[in-house]
Curated annotation (Swiss-Prot):
Keyword Cell inner membrane attached: no
Molecular functions (GO terms): arginine-tRNA ligase activity; ATP binding; glycine-tRNA ligase activity
Cellular component, GO annotation: cytosol
Subcellular location: Cytoplasm
GO biological process: arginyl-tRNA aminoacylation; glycyl-tRNA aminoacylation
Lineage of the organism: Bacteria, Bacillati, Bacillota, Bacilli, Lactobacillales
Cystine residue pairs: none
Signal peptide segment: none
Protein name, per record: Glycine--tRNA ligase beta subunit
Gene (UniProt): glyS
Length: 679
């Protein structure tokens, strides 16, 4: 017979960003716990609010599965003495398994007999296992934790209740400083403590106390209420998924309402208003049918509709204070001169080990000038890039960005346009921050893209140069995001920029403020980011071989890996790769020498291979490039069949190694073929 198990942990209000991950973690750890304890189940349902985490295990077996295990012991010749009696070795073995020598059998393995015992464990009733679920709660991890009262332990927030029910049966367990039972808490203001009758009645019992336990249901309620307000007021409301997910984790009983603000604030840039509403107040933005911002907002109350008019007034008052700040900064910032703000950046620290923001901008400007050539910018674009690089951080010292740091770059563009900068320069100031997340929006303009690349490259190289390199999951300066941004921008614009060569040129640049260092570590860091762009179905050895190539153009690397993975299914792949691998392995002994003297050739096969290598011309057609090298396989094999590479004559030997190295110099731009596993 199956049962349903409810486990609910009641806490003080958790931060919204913690709720959903913690709920999923509880589900996963509970599932692992039950599996480890040989308890089968149909599914695990999840529940959470700001003040609770819960799971309901549906279709839980009423007892553990029986367990039968075979254990191999010592060989028969060790287990029995000369008289055929069990030795101490045999007795010790079975005693350790809780058995006796009477349970011993012998089994033959590869011509020799060994002791075997079979141990059977009858499954225990689920009621005997449930007390251990506190181990699951104790194992939960959180990004932040705290002490409370006189306790020595830490948890995300103080724990008030623990409800553990198997159908209708409540369990009295100890967890941290509380006892479990069937008591739960209702809404902080509208509800009260309540008894949960059974695992199945959980949602209904809490609903009666103004708690909607299911986050999915709360989300649906919020969306339905917003859509009703849309219809009632004839407006269009942006339901931002991230904001919705945050808001539903701020409330236990949601009630959406529409508030208003003075239309005069619409004269402030829309981004300021939207940031004030979404980022600071967690409000949904209201627009008309054409997408124009309206002087309204949608908020969600943690409670019912009683006295809602007071709640609306309170929210309107709070928002107006924010909008007043935005209006003030918008007006005052326009009185500031860009040149004065740029000069003050000399006094703003980028990082104490790296220098000022002004020095960062100077290095970025030099990198941008170099990249302008690589990206093929014309004269006007290059001039716009130089101007943007000279001023692009000025808005960090404006009042608006000081108050709303989410608007950095965005306000820079607006203030630059007001100051008379052209549109390309202004757009680059905004776009240089892109992307702001792993899959965030990328720059649209070439000038903005190059400035973004230059800014990120100096950031990466500077931090690596002073030893501030990400390790494990620790990346306080977001260098992985910056590196991923470089890779994604290069891929989007399809610029044929070889990152390895580019880094080499950057490391030759000289600055008064900093000397770049750790070049190989930076290149490895980029390799790791490019690897994440590749199809996960591509074998690891192929990915490694491609990433170790001497040609480091992002788009080419991704495409080459995919092409090699396709070729791996062809009949000639194994033989071709093995031939090339042999060349790569021997060519390492050439120590970089690729100059070949045809006068030292002693057989036809040497001449044939040299001629074949000479004919290889790499183009932008990556598939054709691969085909050229795979077609060399018979010529390579013939060379090895008739040629002793490591000849006694040093000149002949070195010439043959140089011949092979001349091939790897070309093939190595595709992949390090000896890294590919053909077995």
């Amino acid at each position: 017979m199956v049962k349903n198990l409810l486990v609910e942990l009641g806490l003080e209000e958790m931060p919204a960003y913690v709720v959903t991950p913690s709920m999923k973690q509880l589900r996963d750890k509970m599932g692992a716990f039950l599996t480890d304890h040989r308890l089968t189940f149909e599914k695990i349902e999840m529940f959470s609010t700001p003040r609770r985490l819960a799971v309901r295990v549906v279709g839980l077996a009423d007892k553990q599965s029986d367990l039968t295990e075979d254990f191999k012991g010592p060989s028969k010749k060790i287990a029995l003495d000369a008289d055929g009696n069990f030795t101490k070795a045999a007795e010790g073995f079975v005693r350790g398994k809780g058995l006796t020598v009477e349970d011993i059998t012998f089994r033959e393995i590869k011509g020799e007999e060994y002791v075997y015992v079979t141990k059977e464990e009858i499954g225990r009733p689920v009621e005997e296992i449930i007390p251990a679920v506190t181990e699951v709660l104790q194992a939960l991890t959180f990004p932040v934790s705290m002490h409370w009262a006189n306790n020595t332990f830490e948890y995300i927030r103080p724990v008030h209740t623990l409800t553990v029910l198997l159908d209708e049966q409540a369990f009295d367990l100890d967890f941290l400083d509380i006892k479990s039972g069937r008591t739960s808490r209702g809404h902080r203001f509208l509800g009260q403590e309540t008894e949960i009758a059974s695992a199945d009645s959980y949602e209904d019992d809490l609903r009666a106390q103004f708690v909607i336990a299911s986050p999915l249901e709360r989300g649906d309620m919020i969306v339905d209420q917003i859509q009703a307000l849309e219809e009632e007021h004839g407006v269009s409301i942006e339901i931002d998924e991230d904001l919705l997910n945050e808001v539903l984790n701020l409330v236990e009983y949601p009630t959406a309402f529409l508030g208003n603000f003075d239309a005069k604030y619409l004269e402030v840039p829309e981004e300021v208003l939207v940031t004030s509403m979404k980022e600071h107040q967690r409000y949904f933005v209201v627009r008309d049918s054409e997408g124009k911002l309206l002087p309204h907002f949608i908020s969600v109350r943690n409670g019912n509709a009683e006295h809602l008019e007071n709640v609306i007034k309170g929210n309107e008052k709070v928002l107006v204070a924010r909008l007043e700040d935005g209006e003030f900064f918008w007006r005052e910032d326009q009185k500031l001169a860009i040149a004065d703000l740029v000069e003050k950046l000399n006094n703003v620290t980028f990082h104490e080990k790296i220098g000022s923001l002004a020095e960062h901008m100077e290095r970025t400007g030099k990198i941008a000038a170099l990249l302008a050539q690589e990206a093929g910018l014309d004269a006007d674009e290059t001039a716009d890039l130089a101007r943007a690089a000279a001023i692009y951080k000025f808005d960090l010292l404006t009042g608006m960005v000081g108050e709303f740091d989410e608007l950095q770059g965005i306000m820079g563009e607006k203030y630059a346009l007001l100051a008379g900068e052209n549109a390309a320069v202004a757009a680059a100031i905004r776009e240089h921050y892109m992307p702001t997340s792993a899959d965030g929006e990328l720059p649209d303009t070439k000038v903005g893209a190059v400035l973004a690349l230059a800014d990120k490259l100096d950031t990466i190289l500077s931090f690596f140069s002073v030893g501030l390199i990400p390790s494990g999951s620790n990346d306080p300066y977001a260098l992985r995001r910056a590196t991923q941004g470089v890779v994604r921008i290069l891929d989007k614009f399809g610029w044929n920029i070889d990152l390895a060569q580019l880094l080499g040129r950057l490391y030759e640049l000289k600055f008064d403020s900093l000397s770049y260092d750790n070049q190989e570590a930076v290149l490895d860091f980029f390799r790791a980011r490019v690897e994440k762009m590749m199809d996960r179905s591509i074998p690891k050895d192929i990915v490694t071989a491609v990433l170790q190539s001497t040609h480091f153009v992002v788009r080419d690397l991704v495409e080459t890996a995919a092409l090699l993975a396709e070729k791996a299914q062809e009949d000639n792949f194994k033989s071709a790769v093995e031939s090339l691998s042999r060349v790569f392995n021997l060519a390492e002994k050439a120590q970089g020498q690729t100059a070949v003297n045809p006068a030292l050739f002693e057989n036809k096969e040497e001449k044939d291979l040299a001629a074949a290598i000479e004919k290889v011309v790499l183009t932008s057609d990556l598939a054709a490039n691969l085909d050229q090298f795979f077609a060399l396989s018979p010529v390579i094999d013939a060379f090895f069949d008739h040629t002793m590479v490591m000849a006694e004559d040093e000149a002949v030997r070195n010439n043959r190694l140089a011949l092979l190295a001349s091939l790897t110099a070309k093939a190595g731009q595709i992949a390090q073929f000896n890294q590919i596993n053909t077995k």
